């Protein structure tokens, strides 16, 4: 039963340590979606547990314990839509672990995922309008993070080689909360380590205000977007 779904999963063994946590609010407003996320996490934990055990048994001298951490948070909600952000950190041998983010938009009524594309009259045009904003935002972040004398213009050109309107549309896209309650302030696009820059630079994300793309919103969704995006400090 959905009411019995745990809000936290944990595995502790000598060869594998895993955990998964879920925003409590999800179980209140979207228990069916929460149950789906829990089951997905359970399957991933069990699969990595099995992989770790198999590797340990096959090559115990070179084996290092595996780890997997999964976290889901509710980022924004408006009307029938909610936006979730996932974070996964994993280690399965090698010089370092890997991590990445996941963004999902769900319909509360259907409990199914909804793409940002489905909210837009002309997705390609909306992304083309948003791309310059994303490139400038990432370039500024890279300038602050990496520095080294490189200019924002240099980082912008490098980012443009890795990011296009097409890759954005097929990437990890979510919605963000707004300064105006009960609406979305924009969308966020996530980039995993290696997608932009070196692994050492880490992940990046850029938030595009709804004012940039609202002319491309379908009438059924336009009222759900207003204000300015609420961003992290």
Model-found features: residue ranges?
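Compositionally biased intrinsically disordered regions enriched in Thr/Gly
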Residues: 1-233
């Amino acid at each position: 039963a959905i009411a019995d779904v745990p809000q936290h999963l944990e595995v502790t063994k000598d060869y594998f340590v895993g955990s998964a946590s879920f925003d409590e609010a999800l179980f209140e407003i979207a228990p069916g979606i929460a149950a789906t996320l829990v089951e997905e996490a359970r399957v991933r934990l069990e699969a990595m547990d099995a992989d770790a055990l198999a590797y340990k048994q096959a090559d115990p001298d070179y084996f290092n314990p595996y780890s997997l951490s999964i976290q889901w948070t509710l980022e924004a909600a408006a009307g029938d839509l909610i936006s979730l952000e996932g974070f996964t950190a994993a280690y399965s041998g090698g010089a370092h672990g890997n991590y990445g983010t996941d963004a999902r938009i769900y319909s509360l009524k259907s409990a199914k995922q909804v793409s940002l594309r489905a909210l837009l009259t002309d997705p390609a045009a909306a992304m083309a309008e948003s791309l310059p904003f994303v490139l400038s935002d990432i370039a500024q972040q890279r300038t602050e993070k990496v520095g080294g004398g490189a200019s924002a213009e240099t980082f912008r050109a490098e980012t443009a080689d890795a990011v296009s309107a097409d890759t954005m549309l097929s990437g990890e896209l979510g919605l963000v909360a707004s300064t105006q309650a009960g609406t979305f302030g924009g969308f966020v696009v996530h980039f995993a380590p290696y997608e932009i820059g070196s692994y050492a630079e880490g992940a990046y994300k850029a938030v595009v205000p709804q004012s940039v793309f609202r002319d491309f919103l379908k009438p059924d969704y336009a009222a759900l977007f207003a204000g300015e995006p609420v961003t992290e400090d």
